[in-house]
């Protein structure tokens, strides 16, 4: 796609908005570099992936992503046998941790409700190297600090350092707080040359033994290491040297492990960037209230209620724009300032967005083709250096278009043939259009030449269009009318403004008969189009109501059928139980009868009784194996001590208390929750042990209902605190490590309550305000244990 079209249609403004919605630096950069593709399969794949993230954003909320530094420079250094520093290893840990968080976030997504197959290739790269992750997690933190747990030797050294440092402090306190403090410039302990010293007044130098390490600028203060702490300071320096060596050994070991996983690390970083980039696309779609465009193979364009994305949403006027099908060329005629140019730009910009894998601000069902090139000549782009006139610049642009145009090209020309003698300009415009049409291009042009009004009537596959003008308000409505050419409405406007009638009539008489007839025809077409549009809107509204009513009736019927079936199933279950009991009792009776044949009971009576019982058995056979009944029975017969599955959490637990007729208390791990009997299912004892979850390898995975964020805005304080408590329980059960609490700014009461709760919770590892682009002081990021 040529760069000029991106500039003309302001595509860069779209990529800037997209970049701001990304979280990570690599994704922000990718957003700014986004360009339209002319490959059909690639565009289709991009749109499918954007749809997957849009659905995920709608159902589960935002991915648990935070910004991270690009790790590719670090993996390159690993590739040349270099060892990484602690900060670089901390960055690797963050990348692997984010991959783990996303895997957990997606674990319980129901594939029947959310199809993520389009991003399987991205998710499959999030396979975290277990050994490397464990070693990094115990050795460094995200800030690049080496932890005591990195090795036993380091833990021992740091313990000795802290103990020795305490001894030094105690000795120094004797100087700063005891009788010797009067000899000091300040009662403090400071450090010079990595050794603990005290500031001694110069005249009392002899009161202290030891070593002078420094003096003040005036020379009045000497920084002395007292003799009493010399050995302790020496020991501290020795421990520090040992610590540094041990840290070097640890970093070397971790670098060696990371070197074996270079490909995995790069793949994970690339996938995180890709997911962030796709999520930014989904956020932009939500922000613009955009929808997924459907791709067509015939290079047609059908935009329903299309809106220009750079115009204020409160002011923009949506329009239907169609090109292809019955016509390939559209001429938008009429006066200036009516919205012709904006309509042209809307069509072009939405086309570029779609071919970039972005959703477009138009109604669902909108269709676009995939063009090899989009060319435009819009506005005054005359070159000062070449001293070209507006007309010359205009013609130069069109010449360049004519050299490259073909059937896979969309051409947008504003005011074709303008800037010269109207008669010659109109003739040239007609000739240019004829040439472009022969190349089978899709063409949209605007013009104010009246000579072109008949073009749409005497050329095949060509249609006129115009921008609607309200004669009552004497202002444009900015609505595109397809099928009729526009006109100036000069006489009507003059009358409305109070022009003398005789002057207006004289002007009308001065017009050529042909022009007068054309204007009358246009006026008639305008009236007919308005009537047809009103009728169509009325029919569409009626059809929409009918479809919604049909849907509601179908839902009601389905609900009724389900209720009836449940009642029948329950009745059959009870009947099955009765038959089973009777059969067992009858078998005992028959056994007794057979023993008593010699008492006078006839054998044919026994056979007859067996036949009747077997008939009952056959009738009950299906009931005994009815899976629905078995499931219902499990669900409705539970008691304290039973192991159950809590359906809303997807977790197993034990019933600890019956709270009411239909409500139980269930303990899941360390958490107790209140649940309805409709939300639990009893688990048979031999199935009580849950199967170990498998790490995600394909899209066929189950995922929880827990979201990674909670929005408390607009809630009362008590309500917000209750919802927060429940949400933290849900997040812990779902295995989430990082969640976002959105409390807003307002008076600060909710935020204070949230922070007070988090400080008191034993399940919270840490928390802080969200980054500026994720809510700032209006949201809190929480790390769970």
Curated annotation (Swiss-Prot):
<comment type="function">
    <text>Endonuclease that is involved in the suppression of homologous recombination and thus may have a key role in the control of bacterial genetic diversity.</text>
</comment>
<comment type="function">
    <text>Acts as a ribosome collision sensor, splitting the ribosome into its 2 subunits. Detects stalled/collided 70S ribosomes which it binds and splits by an ATP-hydrolysis driven conformational change. Acts upstream of the ribosome quality control system (RQC), a ribosome-associated complex that mediates the extraction of incompletely synthesized nascent chains from stalled ribosomes and their subsequent degradation. Probably generates substrates for RQC.</text>
</comment>
<keyword id="KW-0540">Nuclease</keyword>
<comment type="similarity">
    <text>Belongs to the DNA mismatch repair MutS family. MutS2 subfamily.</text>
</comment>
<dbReference type="GO" id="GO:0030983">
    <property type="term" value="F:mismatched DNA binding"/>
</dbReference>
<keyword id="KW-0378">Hydrolase</keyword>
<dbReference type="GO" id="GO:0140664">
    <property type="term" value="F:ATP-dependent DNA damage sensor activity"/>
</dbReference>
<dbReference type="Pfam" id="PF01713">
    <property type="entry name" value="Smr"/>
</dbReference>
<dbReference type="InterPro" id="IPR005747">
    <property type="entry name" value="MutS2"/>
</dbReference>
<dbReference type="InterPro" id="IPR000432">
    <property type="entry name" value="DNA_mismatch_repair_MutS_C"/>
</dbReference>
<dbReference type="InterPro" id="IPR002625">
    <property type="entry name" value="Smr_dom"/>
</dbReference>
<dbReference type="InterPro" id="IPR007696">
    <property type="entry name" value="DNA_mismatch_repair_MutS_core"/>
</dbReference>
<dbReference type="GO" id="GO:0043023">
    <property type="term" value="F:ribosomal large subunit binding"/>
</dbReference>
<keyword id="KW-0699">rRNA-binding</keyword>
<keyword id="KW-0067">ATP-binding</keyword>
<dbReference type="GO" id="GO:0072344">
    <property type="term" value="P:rescue of stalled ribosome"/>
</dbReference>
<dbReference type="Pfam" id="PF20297">
    <property type="entry name" value="MSSS"/>
</dbReference>
<dbReference type="GO" id="GO:0016887">
    <property type="term" value="F:ATP hydrolysis activity"/>
</dbReference>
<comment type="subunit">
    <text>Homodimer. Binds to stalled ribosomes, contacting rRNA.</text>
</comment>
<dbReference type="GO" id="GO:0005524">
    <property type="term" value="F:ATP binding"/>
</dbReference>
<keyword id="KW-0694">RNA-binding</keyword>
<keyword id="KW-0255">Endonuclease</keyword>
<dbReference type="InterPro" id="IPR046893">
    <property type="entry name" value="MSSS"/>
</dbReference>
<dbReference type="GO" id="GO:0019843">
    <property type="term" value="F:rRNA binding"/>
</dbReference>
<protein>
    <recommendedName>
        <fullName>Endonuclease MutS2</fullName>
        <ecNumber>3.1.-.-</ecNumber>
        <ecNumber>3.6.4.-</ecNumber>
    </recommendedName>
</protein>
<keyword id="KW-0547">Nucleotide-binding</keyword>
<dbReference type="InterPro" id="IPR045076">
    <property type="entry name" value="MutS"/>
</dbReference>
<dbReference type="InterPro" id="IPR036063">
    <property type="entry name" value="Smr_dom_sf"/>
</dbReference>
<dbReference type="GO" id="GO:0006298">
    <property type="term" value="P:mismatch repair"/>
</dbReference>
<feature type="binding site">
    <location>
        <begin position="334"/>
        <end position="341"/>
    </location>
    <ligand>
        <name>ATP</name>
    </ligand>
</feature>
<dbReference type="GO" id="GO:0045910">
    <property type="term" value="P:negative regulation of DNA recombination"/>
</dbReference>
<keyword id="KW-0238">DNA-binding</keyword>
<feature type="domain" description="Smr">
    <location>
        <begin position="710"/>
        <end position="785"/>
    </location>
</feature>
<dbReference type="InterPro" id="IPR036187">
    <property type="entry name" value="DNA_mismatch_repair_MutS_sf"/>
</dbReference>
<dbReference type="Pfam" id="PF00488">
    <property type="entry name" value="MutS_V"/>
</dbReference>
<dbReference type="InterPro" id="IPR027417">
    <property type="entry name" value="P-loop_NTPase"/>
</dbReference>
<dbReference type="GO" id="GO:0004519">
    <property type="term" value="F:endonuclease activity"/>
</dbReference>
